[in-house]
Amino acid sequence: MMRARAKFAPLFLAGATLLFPPATALGAEQGFTPRLQTPRIAPLGKENRTPEQEAMLASRPDFNIYKTLAHDVDLYNRWSPLGRFILDGSSLPPREREIVMLRMGWLCQSEYEWAQHARIAKAQAGLSNQDIHRIAEGPAAAGWSDFERTLLRMVDELRYDTMISEATWNALRAKYSVQQVIEALYTAAQYQLVSMALNSLGVQLDPGLEDRLPKDGALPAPATQPKSPRLKQPRVPPLAESAWSEEQRKLIAEQKLTGPVLNLYRTMLNHPVLYGPRYKFGSYLQRDSLLPPKTRELLIMRTAALTGAEYEWGHHVEAAQKAGFSAEEIRRIKSGPDAPGWSEEHAAVLRAADELRREAFVSERTWTTLAKYYDTKRLIEIVYTSGGYTMTALAINSLGIQLEPGYPRFP
């Protein structure tokens, strides 16, 4: 049993002004929606599995998250290489990796993510129960090293401001290489996506998980519209073709077939090991998912608007036009689900993106409406598309990826 601690510190930087929304009192009107106590999508039982699902689950632990995601094997297979890299393949020290994961789980109020990674953090990364509780207290809590405070601050900035601040970037670079900063960024972004899925699909705790989200303090605040200006020049410059290694040329070959390589891909070439898993997942969401083109583009462009990712917006205007949206409808995406003119279906899709941004959870009202139009696989892909493009937005904003000339700006 974890002993009671002092109330959690609000999200302050020592000696600085308040950067993020203040902590929300338990039960406050504008706080978090209660999390689900039963699954929205039930884990697959052994008697109902296809050969493809059996193959997917054969190499995974008997956890509810995998048995739930087995409803969409194609999505899982395209996403899991990224997840494996972040969990097992990155160069981040295990303690620092788990601090990042747990902080994001706390900010998203994902009890499953918290319980699983508290277990991993204690067993594999040397964190104590006291350390884990302090993660919920945040960067202002006593006992952190300066760099651990920086990591916690990074997660807070990515959740609330959808980018890493200049001060935090410089503090990260004092210890980490550029590749390691990218890994830390993607670790936070991946576990925001994971939290969105766990919360919205109603994945319930596995037997034997002992840790729970702390209840003896204030909740974190839900996220709102980011306020900081976006970068006007790259922090990580796109890699010039003359500097590409043979490995990087092979990675980028598909993009070269369609013309000049975009800044997004040339920037991500700075981390060739991450490039492949990131592209495999992103290309599924962009081209191969089961979602209708209009649904996909609504999610992508609304997520771009909510995160202040103008690069993402600019590159999807043409795709939205091809999906059948008029210029007026594209402008209306930025106004959100309450703008007049949306169908019930499309308003619910936009509202899902808003709710995932706000509290990493699709509300019962929105889920019920979506379920009138989409089957189980497509419901999962709605969450993953919003979460996946949030991940891309955090990278775009934090790395300073600049929009190429000729692409539309935000209306």
Show where each model-derived region lies.
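Bacterial N-terminal signal peptides that target proteins for export
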Residues: 1-12
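Hydrophobic alpha-helical segments
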Residues: 26-411
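Bacterial N-terminal signal peptides
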Residues: 10-21
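Universal eukaryotic N-terminal targeting presequences
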Residues: 1-3, 18, 25
